[in-house]
Each structure stands twice: as C-alpha cells, then as structure tokens.
Amino acid sequence: MISIILVMIGGGFGAITRSAITDYFNHKFTSKLPIATLIVNLVGSFLIGLNIGLSISISWFPAFFVTGFLGGLTTFSTLAKELTLMMTPKFNINLFLNYSLLQFIIGFIACYIGYHI
C-alpha cells in the first residue's frame, strides 16, 4: 500500500514538473518541433540511466522516483500524439523523421550517459 502512495505522490510531482516545463518552453520558443516533450523525455531518460548506474538501494526510491516521478515527467502518449498530428496534409517527412530520431536515439544516448556517470 505504501508503494502505491509513493507512486501517486511521485507521479503527481512528475506531471506538475512536465506541465511547468511544457508551459515555459511553449511560451519562450516557437519551433516546428515540440521542444518541451523532447526535453522532458531526454531529461527522464538521463535520470533513469543515472538511477540504474548509481544502483540506489533505498527501498522506497524506485516507487517514488522511477515509476512515479519519471513516469509522470516523461510521456510516450504525448509523443505519439505529436507524431500523429505531424501527419497532416502539410506532412513533412523530414520533420517527422528528425523528431522521431531525436526522441528515440538521443533518448537512448541520454540514458546511456546517465548510466555511465
């Protein structure tokens, strides 16, 4: 029961953080790419790699931080929505492929770097 509460609290903080980052970047920058989603996913990938690399052994930490906070921070569903919305009558294959590659390849690299720090 405690782990469920930790996931809920961590997820709430992660979602609030994602919302704040999204609002900030949407107001500060104009781009054809959804920069905010890219940033939260890259930060989340780096942090999960860091968590794996540090082998944090605090019993409550994975539920709160990994499943909760990082689960609330990162977002695959928003990525899927953004990629779908790119497939409009003005579809730009280069934009679509670049954004996809940035998300997945750079996300993996961020996780790898976090793991090896």
From Swiss-Prot:
Q: What species was this sequence derived from?
A: Staphylococcus aureus (strain MSSA476)
Question: InterPro entries, from UniProt?
Answer: FluC
Question: Its family?
Answer: Belongs to the fluoride channel Fluc/FEX (TC 1.A.43) family.
Task: Outline what the protein does.
Answer: Fluoride-specific ion channel. Important for reducing fluoride concentration in the cell, thus reducing its toxicity.
Lineage, top-rank taxon, reads Bacteria
Cellular compartments annotated: Cell membrane
The UniProt catalytic activity note for this protein reads: fluoride(in) = fluoride(out)
The protein's name: Fluoride-specific ion channel FluC 2
Q: Name one cellular component (GO) term.
A: plasma membrane
- The main place the protein resides is membrane
- On whether Membrane is a keyword of this UniProt record, the answer is yes
Segments traversing the membrane:
1-21, 46-66, 95-115
GO molecular function, one example? Answer: fluoride channel activity
Q: Which HAMAP family match?
A: FluC (MF_00454)
Where Na(+) binds, per the record, is at: G71, T74
Alphabetized, the UniProt keywords read: Cell membrane, Ion channel, Ion transport, Membrane, Metal-binding, Sodium, Transmembrane, Transmembrane helix, Transport
Q: Does the keyword Metal-binding apply?
A: yes
Q: How does it sit in the membrane?
A: Multi-pass membrane protein
Residues annotated as coiled-coil are none
